[in-house]
Amino acid sequence: MANKTILFNKHLESNAKMVDFHGWDMPLNYGSQIEEHNAVRQDAGMFDVSHMTVVDVIGNDACAFLRKLLANDVAKLKVPGKALYGGMLDENAGVIDDLITYYLTDTNYRVVVNSATREKDLAWIAKQSQGFDVTVTERPELAMIAVQGPNAKAKAAAVFSSDQNAAIEGMKPFFGKQAGSLFIATTGYTGEAGYEIIVPEDEAQAMWQALLDQGVKPCGLGARDTLRLEAGMNLYGLDMDETINPLAANMGWTIAWEPSDRDFIGRKALETLRDAGTDKLVGLVMEEKGVLRHDMPVFFTDSAGVEHQGVITSGTFSPTLGYSIAMARVPNSIGDTAEVEMRKKRVAVRVVAPNFVRNGKQAF
């Protein structure tokens, strides 16, 4: 029996096409994935992300524990509410999950992890917390709604109370703040401005309806995937997993190597991989007809004339750009051109940084 979020009936009211997503009944679209995608790029759209897992880490050792658990360093977080993206690695430097950590106080952090990895993540966090003075508490009674797009903040402001709007006024990107019953964060998975709003389940349906009444378009998993791929954001299970280290997943910027004596889980293995050199995750652009897809092989010839092969991890048609884009894991000797094998022939592609659209515009 699939899990249902508190907003399940609201999705049916909007004629959502529901699909199984890692054991959750979630909306794929509400009629037109392209229209939903464009709403987020041009106006405002919203996503039910209540399947995500909210975990509070509280205690005297909360900071020390998270500095051990995560490859990024929560000690960098000095201002209450500041958020940090990074990976949780195993001893071999494989990515168990990618997650966002919010610093609330020195003894209180909030972590949001993926739904597909929930049980594995919670078990790993519980195991690693042994010996630390921390309490790890999952918060299943909290729902989450992401409101994204150039007009998202203005439309959300019409739904928030005056006190809530005052609390978040001037909040910079990648912050979160408790404002009344809501935890409002300037984070997202689309490359647009907006909020991710953590809301008590008993208030979630009313908030969803209020956002609908403001003209915020409901968006499903289909648009969520094309938006995140345009923004060059990884999807766990496709672009990285426990067999992939973060350096090979365009997550090198999330690894805090300094201070050198911080012995985070996976550090030694990751240092060995770094020194040996790893594959890298790049962006591909194909302006010919056709769509780049997961698992298609990528070929290129290096400066010495040697052919190398990689693989597409995520691919789609980009509604914003009007042609196909992809992320691919390839040997790091790749230049600025390559070929992808599709329908038994090789098609030329451009190699770019894995960041295709930012704030509605081409980013490469």
Curated annotation (Swiss-Prot):
It holds the Pfam family GCV_T_C. PANTHER family: AMINOMETHYLTRANSFERASE (PTHR43757), AMINOMETHYLTRANSFERASE, MITOCHONDRIAL (PTHR43757:SF2). The keyword Transferase applies. SUPFAM superfamilies: Aminomethyltransferase beta-barrel domain (SSF101790), Folate-binding domain (SSF103025). The glycine cleavage system catalyzes the degradation of glycine. This is Aminomethyltransferase. It comes from Shewanella baltica (strain OS185). Keywords: Aminotransferase, Transferase. One of its GO terms (biological process) is glycine decarboxylation via glycine cleavage system. It catalyses: N(6)-[(R)-S(8)-aminomethyldihydrolipoyl]-L-lysyl-[protein] + (6S)-5,6,7,8-tetrahydrofolate = N(6)-[(R)-dihydrolipoyl]-L-lysyl-[protein] + (6R)-5,10-methylene-5,6,7,8-tetrahydrofolate + NH4(+). InterPro entries: GCS_T, GCS_T_bac, GCST_C, GCV_T_N, GcvT/YgfZ/DmdA, GcvT/YgfZ_C, TrmE/GcvT_dom1. Belongs to the GcvT family. One of its GO terms (cellular component) is glycine cleavage complex. NCBIfam families: gcvT, PRK00389.1. HAMAP family: GcvT.
